[in-house]
């Protein structure tokens, strides 16, 4: 353009002032352009979130950070500028519901109505109905989503809701679906899908029911989020702990081991980027694509794909041989800047955070789909009309789909052709094994008919057994179809269940079913007509023992009849009532005026051996607490529990030594007397506490708190005689009257003598002993027993009980009662439901009250009920009157069950010995009569369903059984069929009567294990903690050929594996487990024999035992670990990928490396390890190599897998382990073992406040290592990370291993102890004081020895050679 337009001119004049700033900007832009090696390609497409992402990534890669930041800023300005001009917002009008919605819903409704109809006619089972309904709604929902997309695309592509969801700015398709489609199926709180979907969307609004259903899921979502945050945080902490000491410490470990990364569908994706090749990579033409240790960038990865490489071997942290760290070349690029990782980078922590951070994005859901099959299968339709022909190899078997459709399943792979009638080219379809065919061989079909459902791959999905109840919808009689062929199955516990063997129907034929009470008997016989109100059955209730009748008032729907079988009046005792402030107290007074306090209240019930009353007397009451002793002759009965005291079996004397005990819990400063001081009665011992008796005080205290003050009363005598003092030391002795205790001390009464030490001096305390005499029998008035010749009897016995056992010390200030005399009830021949009632009666002769004990038999009699849905009307008549005396077995009441509606009675088929529990009346409304218009095609007893033909042109519109055909009149008894699948458990037998709502059968069906799939976080946790799952799969231990046989039970099988050397190992498979292998199949170790979750520990064991037979120990261990590592990495990746989270493999590899780095020592051989010890594999390898050089026995070990928690607790650093969990245990063990912490990781250094050995602190760490190695740089030469187990190496003693062939048989020069050296010197007569020789001395770093000093003494060398500690060289 030569002339500038007016607009441009105008603007140019304006911009003269800004020219300086503009030229500056231009320079900036030029600089950016100069940086660019490749001109940016022109991208002419709609830029959504994904394209934007790629654009920024491209800019970052080609132009660095500054230019990318500038570009992002410009993009932001661009976006905001247009958003300012025309913003995108949502209004209600933007939510456009597609018109197709109503049609789609209508079609779904029709399908579901048809399904329900099939179920009503007994063509499909309850499970198939549920599955079909859910699948129908799921499909409708999908089709509705397509309709929504189509609607927006065609009619309103610039709709703001559509643009937001489509560009990835906000929201997704599932949310748009809920706004303008339908909300769809929801799950209930148990996680099962409710088969009633929410048909409306948020635009139309939800009904109350729909709102309630949909709020289940919403609440669950909120709770999940809260829990997820906590779980995810804890996971991150554990991961950091296990990997915190993985730091890049070496340039190159020089390993030759590697891992193979295979292409998926010819693509490597990002899986190779950032790795280094472990060997030369060549293509099919042997052209070198990359040398060893070449970093793979995206271009190289693409080049590999174009060369059609199936897999590339790369270096990986899993195979790195750097000890306790990772080398740069095995780790590869640091993903932050796509350059080789730096030395000192804490890759462990990066890995831990990369895995832990996305934890919050993972779901925690576990869904039960209720048998929804989600098989990825393709449906094939016919493209022309013609005749179906199966190939010659075809083998099919009958199969019923989860929707109840009869089909055929292919048993082999074959071809199917549809040969057209017109003679054009036939349609050929490949049918793989397991596919379903909906057409028969030779069948003629039209165009667009579903021919087959092709199975996707031979993925054997794991299934589980589930059950569903079939509930009866109407009352009536059960009839089986003969095809069911029920059989009885007895399980291990001996329970018998009835199972259906084939698919078939249970019929329930309508009728009015009556439940009979437990003892009722029918009074009508079968097939008899009955009128309304007629008696159908009668039940009678009789008295068991007989007696006097008492009628009670009715309670609820029954009334109680009591029969007094036995009674007893205590005539020798008057009953007195006394009112106290705490309530009424009743006493029994005997004729000799002794009183017994009643333990029960009149009107209450008591049982056998319960106490009725206790004697009130003070003969056995003491004044204070004290010590109790039984004199010889007093014996007590042995009893299980001493809760009620000890019953005296033979009387005697009870000895009582009083002692006053004050239980005090106060400060010692409140004590007002001295320990062991003599005090008088009434002395204040502690503030506000006074002694009641005179005696010697003993004070018990603990931690300056007064616990007890004991006052032992008696007479105190000073005594210097040591013999006497020793005799009464401790608990003391009882001395009889007249005995001499010590010189000048004699006693007139029985005393207890104890030697005590008081402030006045040593002496003897003579404590008085009180004697209580206990009679052999309790003195009681004569008591009668009421004995009956037959039936229950009762009586009263007296017993004496001691409250305390021999030698017991009663700590008390108040007195206690030592002996109680009790009146007890005795009953004979009673039944558990009988009780004894305590009653009061008025005695007319003495005008006083007496106590009466009564045994009652209680009978509950039903009251009349008008019509009740299951029992019918009942009428009850009492056959007795109040106060009537009845004999045992007399009828008390009869109950009649009356008919509700007239009809014909039928009794169920009698089962041996079982009484009739139900009967059925067939009413008029349970049958219908059909007038046949032609010759009837039906027979009596035939069962028909809706749609069957009566005559040629006339169909029935009801289900049932033909009862009678009378000329043209066909009588049909209405019924309802229920389909049951094979192996269903039948709850009813043929001919049983059922009420509405009873369970008929339990359908057993298989569903894919979608239910409770542990997804998301819990699954990650399960993998990283290496948990042993419940019901894990059975794994094959050795490779071989499969042979499947039937087990001992009908349902169990035994899988045998025949190995190459003809060894057979058998695996019994329990009931309910699915076998995943076929006969004659070749299996390898670790392959699944049954379905179920895998136990990683068992898998490792399988790999190792199999490889152990073929390879050396070390190689077998490494290979087994490698196989397990590969599996673990891919399992963890699967979980994250399924949730759309991308994590680089190397992060997971770093963690898995830590989990599999240890082995368990089984046999230590000649090494210093201990059996059962967990040691690093590398360390064991080094030690075994060293031992084998010297001809010693290497250690035997097995690889182990540790969960992240266990691995953290098993690190070499006890500071790190203790700061993680179980602090006390870790530190205690470390102290006992005398461990040293070498402060290698980050955590232990942080804890004690040192510089961490990563990043800038790494160089300091290397210097420190050099200093640590001291005069032995050779340690570092062969082990750059300085990680020799220094505990095993004495830092001041090194041994050069003999390398000559001669030296092979030489004993190893082990590190001799000081004692060994001393012994050798003395044996060879060497004086250590004069001979300070290198052969016997340890160089100590600072000893500067002259050359001659360092020459070994010939005598010393000779001695060592004789000892066999040196070779002859």
Curated annotation (Swiss-Prot):
EC number: 2.7.7.6
Catalytic reaction annotation: RNA(n) + a ribonucleoside 5'-triphosphate = RNA(n+1) + diphosphate
Gene name, Swiss-Prot/TrEMBL: rpoC2
Protein's name according to its UniProt entry: DNA-directed RNA polymerase subunit beta'
Comp. bias (Low complexity): 1357-1369
Keyword Metal-binding: yes
Role played: DNA-dependent RNA polymerase catalyzes the transcription of DNA into RNA using the four ribonucleoside triphosphates as substrates.
Coiled-coil residue windows: none
Lineage: Bacteria, Bacillati, Cyanobacteriota, Cyanophyceae, Synechococcales
Chain positions covered by the region annotation Disordered: 1-43, 1294-1369
Quaternary structure and partners: In cyanobacteria the RNAP catalytic core is composed of 2 alpha, 1 beta, 1 beta', 1 gamma and 1 omega subunit. When a sigma factor is associated with the core the holoenzyme is formed, which can initiate transcription.
């Amino acid at each position: 353009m030569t002339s500038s337009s007016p607009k441009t001119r105008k603007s140019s004049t304006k911009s003269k002032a800004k020219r300086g700033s503009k030229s500056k900007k231009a320079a900036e832009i030029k600089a950016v352009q100069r940086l660019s090696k490749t001109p940016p390609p022109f991208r002419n497409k709609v830029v959504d979130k994904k394209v934007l992402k790629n654009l920024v990534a491209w800019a970052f890669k080609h132009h660095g950070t500054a230019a990318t930041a500038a570009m992002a800023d410009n993009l932001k300005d661009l976006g905001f500028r247009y958003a300012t001009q025309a913003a995108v917002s949502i209004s209600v009008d933007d939510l456009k519901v597609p018109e197709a919605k109503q049609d789609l819903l209508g079609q779904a409704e029709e399908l579901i109505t048809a399904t329900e109809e099939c179920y009503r006619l007994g063509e499909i089972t309850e499970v198939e109905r549920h599955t079909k309904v859910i699948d129908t709604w799921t499909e409708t929902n999908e089709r509705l989503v397509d309709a929504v997309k189509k609607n927006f695309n065609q009619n309103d592509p610039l709709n703001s809701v559509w643009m937001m969801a489509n560009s990835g700015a906000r929201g997704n398709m599932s949310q748009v679906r809920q706004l303008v489609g339908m909300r769809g199926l929801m799950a209930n709180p148990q996680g099962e899908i409710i088969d009633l979907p929410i048909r409306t969307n948020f635009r139309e609004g939800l009904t109350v029911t729909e709102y309630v259903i949909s709020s289940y899921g919403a609440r669950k979502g909120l709770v999940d989020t809260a829990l997820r945050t906590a779980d995810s945080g804890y996971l991150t902490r554990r991961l950091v702990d296990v990997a915190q000491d993985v730091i890049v410490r070496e340039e190159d470990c020089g390993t030759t081991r590697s891992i193979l990364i295979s292409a998926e569908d010819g693509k490597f994706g990002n899986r190779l980027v950032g790795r280094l090749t472990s060997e030369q990579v060549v293509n099919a033409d042997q052209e070198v694509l990359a040398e060893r240790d070449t970093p793979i960038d995206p271009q190289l990865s693409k080049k590999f794909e174009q060369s059609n490489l199936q897999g590339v071997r790369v270096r990986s942290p899993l195979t790195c041989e750097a000890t306790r760290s990772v080398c740069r070349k095995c780790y590869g690029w640091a993903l932050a800047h796509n350059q080789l990782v730096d030395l000192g980078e804490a890759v462990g922590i990066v890995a831990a955070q990369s895995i832990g951070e996305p934890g919050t994005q993972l779901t925690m859901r576990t869904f039960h789909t209720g048998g929804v099959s989600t098989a990825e299968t393709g449906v094939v339709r016919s493209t022309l009309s013609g005749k179906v022909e199966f190939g010659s190899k075809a083998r099919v078997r009958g199969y019923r789909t989860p929707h109840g459709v009869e089909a055929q399943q292919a048993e082999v792979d074959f071809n199917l052709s549809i040969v057209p009638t017109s003679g054009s080219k036939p349609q050929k379809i490949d049918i793989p094994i397991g596919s379903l065919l909906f057409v028969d061989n030779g069948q003629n079909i039209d165009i667009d008919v579903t021919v087959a459902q092709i199975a996707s791959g031979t993925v054997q999905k794991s299934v589980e057994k589930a059950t569903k109840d079939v509930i009866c919808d109407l009352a009536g009689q059960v009839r089986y179809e003969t095809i069911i062929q029920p059989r009885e199955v007895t399980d291990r516990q001996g329970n018998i269940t009835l199972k259906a063997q084939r698919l078939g129907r249970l019929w329930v034929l309508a009728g009015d079913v009556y439940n009979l009470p437990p003892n009722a008997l029918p009074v009508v016989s079968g097939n008899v007509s009955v009128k309304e109100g007629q008696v159908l059955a009668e039940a009678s209730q009789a008295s068991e023992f007989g007696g006097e009748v008492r009628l009670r008032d009715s309670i609820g729907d029954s009334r109680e009849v009591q029969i007094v079988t036995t009674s007893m009046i205590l005539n020798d005792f008057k009953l007195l009532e006394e009112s106290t402030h705490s309530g009424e107290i009743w006493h029994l007074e005997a004729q000799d005026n002794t009183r017994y306090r009643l333990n029960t209240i009149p009107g209450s019930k008591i049982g056998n051996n319960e106490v009725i009353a206790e004697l009130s007397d003070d003969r056995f009451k003491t004044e204070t607490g004290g010590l109790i002793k039984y004199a010889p002759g007093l014996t007590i009965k042995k009893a299980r529990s001493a809760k009620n005291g000890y019953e005296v079996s033979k009387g005697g004397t009870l000895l009582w030594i009083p002692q006053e005990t004050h239980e005090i819990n106060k400060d010692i400063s409140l004590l007002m007397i001295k320990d062991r001081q003599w005090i008088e009665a009434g002395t204040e011992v502690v503030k506000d506490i006074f002694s009641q008796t005179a005696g010697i005080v003993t004070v018990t205290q603990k931690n300056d708190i007064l616990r007890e003050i004991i006052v032992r009363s008696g007479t105190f005598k000073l005594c210097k005689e040591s013999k006497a003092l020793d005799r009464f030391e401790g608990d003391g002795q009882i001395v009889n009257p007249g005995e001499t205790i010590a010189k000048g001390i004699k006693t007139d009464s029985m005393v207890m003598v104890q030697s005590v030490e008081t402030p006045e001096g040593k002496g003897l305390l003579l404590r008085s002993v009180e004697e209580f005499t206990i009679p052999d029998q309790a003195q009681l008035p004569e008591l009668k027993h009421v004995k009956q010749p037959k039936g229950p009897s009762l009586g009263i016995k007296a017993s004496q009980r001691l409250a305390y056992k021999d030698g017991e010390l009663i700590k008390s200030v108040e007195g206690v009662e030592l002996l109680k005399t009790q009146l007890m009830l005795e009953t004979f021949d009673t039944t558990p439901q009988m009780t004894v009632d305590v009653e009061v009666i008025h005695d007319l002769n003495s005008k006083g009250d007496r106590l009466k004990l009564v045994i009652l038999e209680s009978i509950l009699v039903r009251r009349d009920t008008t019509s009740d849905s299951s029992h019918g009307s009942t009428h009850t008549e009492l056959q007795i009157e109040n106060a009537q005396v009845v004999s045992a077995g007399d009828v008390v009441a009869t109950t009649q069950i009356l008919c509700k509606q007239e009809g014909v009675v039928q009794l169920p088929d009698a089962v041996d010995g079982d009484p009739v529990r139900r009967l059925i009346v067939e009413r008029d409304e349970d049958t219908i009569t059909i007038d046949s218009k032609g010759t009837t095609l039906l027979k009596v007893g035939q069962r028909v369903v809706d749609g069957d033909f009566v005559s040629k042109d006339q169909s029935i519109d009801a289900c049932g059984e033909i009862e009678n055909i009378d000329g043209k009149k066909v009588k049909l008894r209405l019924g309802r069929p229920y389909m049951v699948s094979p192996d269903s458990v039948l709850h009813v037998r043929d001919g049983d009567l059922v009420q509405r709502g009873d369970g008929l059968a339990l359908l057993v069906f298989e569903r894919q294990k979608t239910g409770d799939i542990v997804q998301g976080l819990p699954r990650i946790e399960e993998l990283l903690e290496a948990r042993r799952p419940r019901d894990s799969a059975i794994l094959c231990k050795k490779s071989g050929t499969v042979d499947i046989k039937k087990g001992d039970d009908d349902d169990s099988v035994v899988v045998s594996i025949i190995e190459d050397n003809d060894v057979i190992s058998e695996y019994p498979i329990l009931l309910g487990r699915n076998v995943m292998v076929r006969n004659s199949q070749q299996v390898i170790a670790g392959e699944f024999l049954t379905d179920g979750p895998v136990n990683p520990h068992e898998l490792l064991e399988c790999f190792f035992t199999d490889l152990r037979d073929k390879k050396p120990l070390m190689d077998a261990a490494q290979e087994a670990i490698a196989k397990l590592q590969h599996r673990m990495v891919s399992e963890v990746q699967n979980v994250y990928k399924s949730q759309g989270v991308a994590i680089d493999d190397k992060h997971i590899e770093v963690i898995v490396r830590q989990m599999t780095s240890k082995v368990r020592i089984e046999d230590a051989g000649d090494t210093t390890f201990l059996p059962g010890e967990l040691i690093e594999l590398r360390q064991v390898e080094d030690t075994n190599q060293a031992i084998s050089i010297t001809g010693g026995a290497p250690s035997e070990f097995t690889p182990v897998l540790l969960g992240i928690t266990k691995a953290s607790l098993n690190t070499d650093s006890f500071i790190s382990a203790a700061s993680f969990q179980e602090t006390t245990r870790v530190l205690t063990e470390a102290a006992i073992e005398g461990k040293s912490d070498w402060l290698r990781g980050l955590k232990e250094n942080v804890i004690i406040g040192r510089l961490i050995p990563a990043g800038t602190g790494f160089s300091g760490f290397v210097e420190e290592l050099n200093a640590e190695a001291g005069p032995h740089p050779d340690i570092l030469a062969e082990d750059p990370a300085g990680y020799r187990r220094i505990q095993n190496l004495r830092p001041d003693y090194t041994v050069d291993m003999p390398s000559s062939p001669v030296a092979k048989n030489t004993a190893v020069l082990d590190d001799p102890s000081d004692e060994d050296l001393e012994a050798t010197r003395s044996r060879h007569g060497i004086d250590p004081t004069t001979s300070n020789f290198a052969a016997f001395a340890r160089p100590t770093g600072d000893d500067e020895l002259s050359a001659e000093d360092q020459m070994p003494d010939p005598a010393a060398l000779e001695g060592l050679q004789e000892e066999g500690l040196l070779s002859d060289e």
